[in-house]
C-alpha cells in the first residue's frame, strides 16, 4: 500500500466522486470526514480548496451528475447533490457531505434508557427495550433560529429527533460523535449522540503537537480503517479499529531506516504510545486530537494545514 504523509506531499492524482444532483448554491462547504473541502461552482468550472491546495477544474460531459476535470493535474470531481466522494492518489477519502445537510443515512443513540434511531433516505426505525417501531416516511427540516447547524427529524406528530452539529460524548463509553441528538417522545426527552465517530478523525493528517523535529511525526486515518503516517524517522502503515467502546491499532508495519538519535527516540515514543491507545477525544472545533489510554493522554496532535 502506498504511503501518504500529508496533504502537502500528496501526489498529482486527485479524484473526487459522488452521489445526488448538482449543488444549488455557488459555494459549497463539504466535510469529508475531518477534511474541509470548499467548492466554488460556475457554469463552466469548479474551484476546489482543501488543505493548502487550490485547483480549478473544467466542466466535462457526464451521463449523470456534474463532472469536472483538470487533466494536467490528473484531477476529477463528479458530484450529485449534497454528497461527494474524494480520492487522492488512489486513496479513497471519507464521504463528503454538504455541511448544511444531514447525511442521507445515519444513526442516533442514547443510554439510560437505551434508544437507537436509524434514519435511511427518508424513512426511520426506533429500537427500545419496550419495543421497536418503524416510520416509513419522516420529514427532515433545518432549524433556522439556532447558532449552529440543527435539524428536526419529524418521526410522527408527537415524536421528533433533533440533531445538532456539535461534538457529543457518549455518556457510558466516552466515545466522541460528530452530532448531538435529542429524542422527544411521549412527553419525554432523551439525550444522545449521532453520526459516525471516524468522521471526526479520518481524511486529514494529524501532526504531533510541540514536536522539535524539522518534520514532526504524523498520522492519518482513513474511512476504510487503514492508517499511515511518519514516526519521526520511518513511514508506517496498518489498520485501526474503532468500536463502540474505543480506538485501538493492529500491529503496524514500518520501513527500517536509521536516523539521528532524537528522531529514533521520537519514533520509539510514538510507536509505544500507539500500542497503548484505547480512546480518543477531539477539541478546538475539531482541530486537535488526543490519543488516550483511558484517562491518560498519550499523544497530542493538531490538524495539519
Question: Residue ranges of each PLM-predicted region?
Answer:
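Periplasmic N-terminal soluble interaction domains immediately after the signal peptide in Gram-negative
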Residues: 73-74
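Lipid interaction determinants
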Residues: 22-27, 66, 80-108, 136-140, ...
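Post-signal peptide N-terminal segment of mature Sec-exported envelope proteins
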Residues: 26-51
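C-terminal motif of bacterial Sec signal peptides marking the signal peptidase cleavage site
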Residues: 15-18
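Bacterial N-terminal signal peptides that target proteins for export
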Residues: 1-8
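An ectodomain-focused feature that recognizes extracytoplasmic/extracellular
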Residues: 100-124
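Central antiparallel beta-sheet cores of small beta-barrel/beta-sandwich binding domains
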Residues: 51-69, 117-160, 237-238
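Short acidic-hydrophobic surface loop/beta-edge motif
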Residues: 28-31, 68-69, 106-110, 151-156
Amino acid at each position: 500500500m502506498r504511503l501518504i504523509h500529508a496533504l502537502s506531499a500528496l501526489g498529482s492524482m486527485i479524484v473526487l466522486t459522488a452521489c445526488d444532483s448538482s449543488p444549488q448554491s455557488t459555494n459549497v462547504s463539504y466535510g469529508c470526514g475531518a477534511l474541509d473541502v470548499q467548492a466554488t461552482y460556475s457554469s463552466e468550472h469548479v474551484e476546489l480548496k482543501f488543505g493548502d491546495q487550490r485547483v480549478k477544474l473544467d466542466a466535462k460531459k457526464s451521463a449523470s451528475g456534474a463532472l469536472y476535470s483538470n487533466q494536467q493535474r490528473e484531477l476529477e470531481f463528479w458530484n450529485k447533490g449534497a454528497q461527494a466522494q474524494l480520492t487522492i492518489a488512489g486513496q479513497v477519502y471519507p464521504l463528503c457531505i454538504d455541511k448544511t445537510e444531514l447525511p442521507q443515512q445515519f444513526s442516533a443513540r442514547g443510554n439510560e434508557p437505551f434508544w437507537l434511531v436509524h434514519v435511511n433516505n427518508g424513512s426511520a426505525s426506533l429500537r427500545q427495550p419496550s419495543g421497536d417501531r418503524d416510520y416509513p416516511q419522516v420529514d427532515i427540516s433545518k432549524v433556522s433560529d439556532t447558532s449552529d447547524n440543527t435539524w428536526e427529524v419529524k418521526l410522527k406528530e408527537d415524536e421528533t429527533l433533533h440533531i445538532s452539529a456539535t461534538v457529543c460524548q457518549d455518556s457510558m463509553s466516552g466515545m466522541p460523535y460528530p452530532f448531538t441528538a435529542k429524542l422527544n417522545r411521549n412527553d419525554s426527552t432523551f439525550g444522545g449522540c449521532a453520526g459516525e465517530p471516524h468522521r471526526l478523525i479520518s481524511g486529514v493528517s494529524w501532526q504531533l503537537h510541540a514536536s522539535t523535529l524539522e518534520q514532526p511525526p504524523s498520522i492519518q486515518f482513513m474511512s476504510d480503517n487503514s492508517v499511515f503516517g511518519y514516526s519521526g524517522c520511518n513511514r508506517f502503515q496498518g489498520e485501526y479499529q474503532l468500536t463502540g467502546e474505543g480506538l485501538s491499532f493492529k500491529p503496524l508495519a514500518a520501513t527500517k531506516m536509521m536516523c539521528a538519535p532524537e528522531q529514533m527516540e521520537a519514533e520509539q515514543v510514538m510507536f509505544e504510545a500507539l500500542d497503548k491507545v484505547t480512546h480518543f477525544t477531539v477539541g478546538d472545533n475539531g482541530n486537535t486530537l488526543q490519543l488516550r489510554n483511558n484517562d491518560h493522554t498519550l499523544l497530542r496532535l493538531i490538524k495539519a494545514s
